Amino acid sequence: MSSVAKDMSLVKVGFYSPENMDFSVMVKEMSSAADFDAVMIADSGNRLKSMASMFAYNDIMYPDVLFLGTSAWDNTNLSKETILYHGVYPMVSKSYGTYFTDKYKETFGEQPKSIYSFAYDSVLLASVLSTKDRNDLDAALTGKSGFIGVNGFFKILPTGQSYHSLEMLEITKDGPKVVSKADNRNSDYVDSEIDIRYIPYEKLPKFYGKSSSEVLKWLYNN
């Protein structure tokens, strides 16, 4: 989303060392820099909590100022951080990812890291594209139709960049709440997405590091 297109402007950026836990000086300077109605904190864990507390100490809080985050916020339990209530952050669709997470936990007995689902989608995408002629590969990969994977809708742009539909989550006392659902398809090409979540057995990609029986159970609940 372009801040220019949305008639927004960036008024201040703060930098700090990853080892730093004292944000008093930086936050004080930022708080007095200019009028603003939103603050983005691209961090997580104790640094996020400490920084939010320092903003509140300087009277920077909701409803006058909205806190914005990144997907890194999802790695921190913020249900007790009242200062961050109503704050929002983007995340890949949990409704799509639930299937992958449940199957992974059932098979391997542990919670998958977020990057695992992206790797899974990448392998499935490679499997789908392997049926294409070499001369048509680029067009198939960067086509406007896009794909639907275990993380929801995505497409690869001709520039080499990628677009991924995201949902917006709001911090509440009961945990993250979905306030804006992720698009499940490309609105410009509503009938053209290739769903790569469900591929016939004979077209499955090869898996390494896990036995075939584990993979089959994971995918097909055998």
Q: What annotation goes with each model-predicted range?
A:
Residues 1-222:
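Extracytosolic ligand-binding ectodomains
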